[in-house]
């Protein structure tokens, strides 16, 4: 049976590594959705490369039975661009968080989108620096109290959609970790898109920012949500 005739299953994309995210972390759901999306698209594991920077979400390449590269802080987009340029036949994915992507990596992010190279960028947004134990991030809301903003941050947050569209991106989607069906469908559409795609996934950090997306998932909770 040829690769083209092979029907891949989600389990074919799972590595044998122990998943080292906190119990209840939204990253688990996104990983499972990515496995399902890749099976739906039918990309062979050996034709896929998953690149990441630094942060909780950036451990994801370890959990994929594909080529992977856990790189340095903020530089994932630049390295993913290099991988795609050298191996245009590969399905290249960048896994990044709000701090990794929009602070130290902001320059690389907007230029990757501007160049419109065929990259799949998945931005995990929990509005906090989780790996370094709870500092505010570029997407934290004004007034957010954290270890690095004990009196509340005085800064307005970046809105990933505005950055992506401002860089002339032509594929932006936003989904949330608890909606597995929609997240899988969005990642599938991202994989099939030709050019740079940006998928923002709102994820919950149960340790340092639990319930940050309550206004979206809780129908009893009223909140102003800006996109």
Model-inferred region functions:
Residues 56-130, 182:
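Thiamine diphosphate
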Residues 17, 44-48, 86-92, 114-120, ...:
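Short coil/turn connectors at secondary-structure junctions
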């Amino acid at each position: 049976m040829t690769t083209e005739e092979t029907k891949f299953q989600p389990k074919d994309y799972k590595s044998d590594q122990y998943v080292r995210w906190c119990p209840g972390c939204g990253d688990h759901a996104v990983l499972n959705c990515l496995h399902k999306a890749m099976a739906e698209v039918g990309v062979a594991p050996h034709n896929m490369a998953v690149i990441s920077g630094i942060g909780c979400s950036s451990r994801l390449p370890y959990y994929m039975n594909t080529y992977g590269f856990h790189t340095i802080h903020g530089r994932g987009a630049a390295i993913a661009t290099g991988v795609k340029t050298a191996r245009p036949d590969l399905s290249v994915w960048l896994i990044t968080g709000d701090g990794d992507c929009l602070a130290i990596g902001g320059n690389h992010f907007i230029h990757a989108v501007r160049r419109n190279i065929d990259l799949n960028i998945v931005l995990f947004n929990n509005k906090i620096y989780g790996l370094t134990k709870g500092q505010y991030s570029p997407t934290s809301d004004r007034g957010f109290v954290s270890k690095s903003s004990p009196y509340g941050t005085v800064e307005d947050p970046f809105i990933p959609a505005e950055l992506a569209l401002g860089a002339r991106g032509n594929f932006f989607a936003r989904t949330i970790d608890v909606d597995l069906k929609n997240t899988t469908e969005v990642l599938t559409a991202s994989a099939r898109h030709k050019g740079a795609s940006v998928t923002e996934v709102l994820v919950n950090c149960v340790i340092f920012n639990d319930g940050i997306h309550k206004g979206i998932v809780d129908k009893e909770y009223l909140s102003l949500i800006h996109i």
